Amino acid sequence: MTKMSKLPNDLLEEILSRSPLYSMRAIRLTCKKWNTLAKEESFTKKQLVQTKAAKEFMVIMMMDSKFCLMNINLNKEEDVEPSIKCNGKIINPIGMCRVYHCGGLVCITKSFSNTRDVVWNPYLGQTRWIKPRSHHAYIYAIGYETKKSCRSYKILSSEHNYINIDDERVDYEIYELDSNSWRALDVNSNWATAFYKMDVSVKGNSYTYTDYRGDFLISFDFTTERFGPTLPLPFHSRCGDIVALSSVREEKLAVLLHRCNISRMEIWITNKIEPNNVSWGKLFLTVDMKPLIIDDGIFFIDEEKKVVVVFDKDKEMRNRITAYIIGENGYFRKVDLGDSESFPVRCSYVPSSVEIKQLAKGKSN
């Protein structure tokens, strides 16, 4: 019998790429050869193909101070129920409560009075702790610009300074992972209150919904390091409506609208999205559904299967989190995720082999 260590690389890659994502740390630690193989772009692509073939996609969620990598199986066959599997705690989240994802990297941070943030690649198991220049800085987004076919990752933060009750100044800074350094950003923005909402990254840039002084999207371009013009939504919301954003495999933007006075949820997906331009497709899905309890509107989309997963507090037992899996022609399933006193914090996750450069011991920003 041929030993695994003696197998040719192409066959070994084919076998190991079929392993679930949460097994990758054990695979990388097995030997130096496997660790090198797991970092290859071809290996990552094969694993993504296997994940898609298994009719699953991945999300990262924090429930009751535990970050979990969840596999969501959206099989719509009549004899196979959809499932959501939590693969256990994957990072120490003490004091962390906000999650941002872009291009395979995840930034986890506190909301306010921040002392440290962490950038993390769950696929490679790499992390870097980042110390903000101010304890009152607030992480707004993570994104990247492309330089000579390579991605240069950056983090945008803001610090809100209240001069008086009617006057607020917002200072912005950019952190570059490549240089491990912060620098001041000379930009102006009138959308300070919007930054308390969760942003969504698409193609390396950031998008946030705001109902402050209007009803639209705000973009930040990580290449020009500038805010773009306001971008229209495919609807006009009213006071009390729930509006939420999600990305579709980081290639498209999706928006959810749940009217406060009627039991109907509507979802649209972009045809085109850029920091300076957006084009919305026709209505993607309409569902008759009772109003959501969690006003963040946590949802994910599988565009190919035309299925939406919405996370919310259970309507009858408010201490439990429920995933509602919704599709066309009245398709509706519920998956109980268990007890959670806090609202879940989440982001979708697409694996990437992008490495986080490790700093020399004792070196910090």
Swiss-Prot record:
Q: Which PROSITE patterns match?
A: FBOX (PS50181)
Which stretches make up the F-box domain? 1-47
Q: Where are the Kelch repeats?
A: 98-149, 155-205
UniProt keyword Repeat present: yes
Q: Which InterPro entries match?
A: F-box-assoc_dom_typ1 (IPR006527), F-box-assoc_interact_dom (IPR017451), F-box-like_dom_sf (IPR036047), F-box_dom (IPR001810), SCF_F-box_component (IPR050796)
Query: Which UniProt key words apply to this protein?
Result: Kelch repeat, Repeat
Q: What is this protein called?
A: Putative F-box/kelch-repeat protein At3g16880
